[in-house]
Amino acid sequence: MIHKFDVVVVGGGHAGCEAAAAAARAGARTALVTMRRDTIGVMSCNPAIGGIGKGQLVREVDALDGLMGRVADAAGIQFRLLNRRKGPAVRGPRTQADRKLYRQAMQAVISEQENLQVIEAEVHTLGMEHGRITHVGLSGDSQINCAAVVLTTGTFLRGLIHIGQKKIPAGRVNEPAAKGLSASMEAAGFKLGRLKTGTPPRLDGRTIEWNMLGFQKADEDPVPFSLLSEKIQNPQITCGITRTTTDTHRIIQENLDKSAMYSGQIEGIGPRYCPSIEDKIVKFGERDGHQIFLEPEGLDDHTVYPNGLSTSLPEEVQHAFLKTIPGLANAHVLQPGYAIEYDHVDPRELEPSLETRRVRGLFLAGQINGTTGYEEAAAQGVIAGINAASVASGSTTVVPSRTDAYIGVMIDDLVTRGVTEPYRMFTSRAEFRLSLRADNADERLTPRAIEWGVASKVRRDRFYKAEQELSDARELTKARGLTPNEAARHGIAVNQDGVRRSAYDLLSFADINIERLKAIWPELGSIAPKTCERLETEARYAVYLDRQVADAERVRREEGRSIPDGIDFDSVPGLSNELKYKLRQRRPRTLAEAQRIDGMTPAALALILVAIRQGEKIRGAA
């Protein structure tokens, strides 16, 4: 049987759902091909969305009218704004999610999406002619003719689960790996690498001694991810907190030779910033304990996810070390922890549109590009889906730049630097993080979504309303002001320079907020609370944004500057140990070469530039 679609998306995970929905919103007749319809939207690992850097990505996906933010709001059961006490530029919205509710909500929005059809099958082959995608071959000798394909295969490409010395070919527990597709990719000339990730054992919450634990509560005022979410409806839960002990560490040390990671059985490299418990014990042996968060997986589910205990040790060793952790002595293991290896493509094979250079019309998104995390996958999926629809219709492809979005930062990092380990997003990766905040994602990207034709009428109307309210509030505060003497009478300390300062200017002062200004100008009480928060943040950062842009420009001008052979990177203050090691190994000759080192940040590059200049001054004075 032969089907015909404009775009085919392979895989129904976080990248696949976003890619399929985005292509369909762009007007392409789209097929989402998945081995099992009931696993669309499954959270394979941790039951959480967002976090530092990751929460910004979710907001950006939502600003492009993507799905993840709305679905997380519908399924969230413990909302927390991380770094709440710090500045808005580094705050990260996060929620624990009910696995069942998340899957159900994602499947609902996929089924309701116009131009989108779900096909239950396995893709075995990619059809190409003259370097361009033409079709995909399915199980059962069917094929789908198409103009563009988006591969979002997650951990399924030749996936191999490791539990101790046991190996199980699978893409996820009890789900088969995809084997034919890897061979088809290699036949097309793609060189595949191996990466690895892991997951902890799942525990029965009814067998945990909760009275022995610390607790972490949800925020009292949960902040939704999506502009379209009015409020959070689900009850909010509490998570337990415990720690490993010296006995835990002893058992793990004694059994390292049985770990799939440390026995040499695993080829793939794992995510540095989500280490296994074996890695923690080996690399941080001086510590007497590591914190573990016990995260309930649902409102009516007894399963608990022990965040921080990812492992590939044998089941009997997992049982043994769990008994040494406070509160878990009698915990029943529902599913053992495991590591999983899978194939990936060097992302330097891609254009910034996420189309492969080798095969036109073929797009890649998610873990196949060497990233880790639901949020990173979803963000790539949106862009790949929009661009696949563009290729199918003969339109120009699009991509946010590093100055526009964390999505742009991530894609630029991937296609220019490649990966040596699974890539995850951090706020430190962005040069312009003061302007790439979670709270202004709509302002930055929804106009692009409207321009690209992927924003719904509901999204457009809500966005225009919010922007008009912010504009009105800005005008209202800029039209009211105080002289230094008037400010002093209201208890506001400013320089006695005779300059009149508007209410908007006063909001940039650390001790001034809109509530304090309402006492002076009661009419400011007409500004909605959400708008007040946006206005305060905008005013507070305005004075710093110009400086940030100037710093970035200075680094760009200096990219060709040579790095002296004798520079001691270990003596450069502020550099992380990770970067010091990579700099010693690579010995870059110029700042431009240093910039391409995986993990290099704009701030670190500026520190190296300062060290070079200081060395030049010392040599000049000698």
From Swiss-Prot:
Transmembrane segments: none annotated. One of its GO terms (cellular component) is cytosol. GO terms for molecular function: flavin adenine dinucleotide binding. Pfam families: GIDA, GIDA_C_1st, SAM_GIDA_C. FAD binds at G11, G12, G13, H14, A15, G16. It is found in: Cytoplasm. Keywords: Cytoplasm, FAD, Flavoprotein, NAD, tRNA processing. Its main location: cytoplasm. Its cofactor is FAD. NAD(+) binds at residues 270-284. GO terms for biological process: tRNA methylation; tRNA wobble uridine modification. InterPro entries: FAD/NAD-bd_sf (IPR036188), GIDA_C_N (IPR049312), MnmG (IPR004416), MnmG-rel (IPR002218), MnmG-rel_CS (IPR020595), MnmG_C (IPR026904), MnmG_C_subdom (IPR047001), MnmG_C_subdom_sf (IPR044920). NAD-binding protein involved in the addition of a carboxymethylaminomethyl (cmnm) group at the wobble position (U34) of certain tRNAs, forming tRNA-cmnm(5)s(2)U34. Belongs to the MnmG family. Homodimer. Heterotetramer of two MnmE and two MnmG subunits. This is tRNA uridine 5-carboxymethylaminomethyl modification enzyme MnmG. It comes from Chelativorans sp. (strain BNC1). The gene is mnmG.
